[in-house]
């Protein structure tokens, strides 16, 4: 039984689903998708549970979220294993994901109070008060690259705000979604407050079309995000939060520490096997001896990376991609770059046939025409050379996306210029593109999404503001507006 609807585990009535080990192809999980009737039942359960949940004291909702965090800590080893197996990321990295899930509860509590709590402003004859109210029933669509952490970043703040939810994890990581839901169950969530529906595209389309929804929180590809935007067009009453991908540039300008710069580039491009939305896809390197030395060292160090199983010892830097099919798509993109005239610097290769273990690829694309402005979700890095910093910024902004952008340079003035001219939601200096602060907003512009539905600003998407002018008493003003006459006796 893989669905959790109205406080009960049940078997899906839709198509059969299974999850296999991306590296070894062994069966990890099997179940069935929710059919349309079960999606409707999940939304109806969330709608029925909303009034009571929204009216519960905030302290009650906080206590359940904190119990969930404690359960994550108690079950960290097992949840780490499940995430690592499903995604094929190394154990060390899966463990950091669970830690991020635990920390998200405290961060969300602080963000709720800071960004969406009550604010009172005194007035001469009363007070102005800002309060926030939950939207109602929200759908949460989770991605596969961080199947615990990223949906958690929507679920926790949404529940704290008083919303009820229907959660659809990625069909590529159903086991993680089920395992996390069982911890919420143990934390004591009332029936219907959080519901789980498994499934692929058909389930997602059925869920996003439900009239019971007051909003949808999505993390995933730009293609799916655009489809959801079209589907909800003409429904301004529904909140739609889209956190999508990026074709992210990393500029390298005369680094004074070659190995330090190479380390930042590898962390930016190849961590999580290149499956982070903030990963560097385009490396912009200044022409000259320093740039040549940097590139040569990058190719050398990246060539030493050996992807391996999640539980291999010693632990690898990279695991595999989410599936063998995903690895093949990266290789197809590589071949496309070659066919357009790209110069291979480091050729990617499968560690074993039929596996998702793929070594990094680096290809120079300077002067190559018609390079697709698409996010290749894997360990593939394109290189462009430039002559001056203005050209670098022009290249960096030459994308429909706008998620992350970074600069490796000892010169602060270069970063100041980039801050003014970059079109990206995250702009880092001498830090990995994949680095983000939990106390800062996360998101981008353009095809990367509608601004900041994640991290510190997630609370903004989970509640709407209510403004009030308040006074415990009232009386006839001494000075009246023109045309008002209160003279004579009071009318009986």
Swiss-Prot record:
Keywords: Arginine metabolism, NAD, Oxidoreductase. The active site is at residues 243, 277. GO terms for biological process: arginine catabolic process to glutamate; arginine catabolic process to succinate. Disulfide bonds: none annotated. It comes from the Bacteria. The keyword NAD applies. One of its GO terms (molecular function) is succinylglutamate-semialdehyde dehydrogenase activity. NAD(+) binds at residues 220-225. InterPro entries: Ald_DH/histidinol_DH, Ald_DH_C, Ald_DH_CS_CYS, Ald_DH_CS_GLU, Ald_DH_N, Aldehyde_DH_dom, SuccinylGlu_semiald_DH_AstD. Its EC number is 1.2.1.71. Pathway: Amino-acid degradation; L-arginine degradation via AST pathway; L-glutamate and succinate from L-arginine: step 4/5. It catalyses: N-succinyl-L-glutamate 5-semialdehyde + NAD(+) + H2O = N-succinyl-L-glutamate + NADH + 2 H(+). Pfam families: Aldedh (PF00171). HAMAP family: Aldedh_AstD. NCBIfam families: arg_catab_astD (TIGR03240), PRK09457.1 (NF006992). Belongs to the aldehyde dehydrogenase family. AstD subfamily. Catalyzes the NAD-dependent reduction of succinylglutamate semialdehyde into succinylglutamate. This is N-succinylglutamate 5-semialdehyde dehydrogenase. It comes from Cronobacter sakazakii (strain ATCC BAA-894) (Enterobacter sakazakii). The lineage of its organism: Bacteria, Pseudomonadati, Pseudomonadota, Gammaproteobacteria, Enterobacterales.
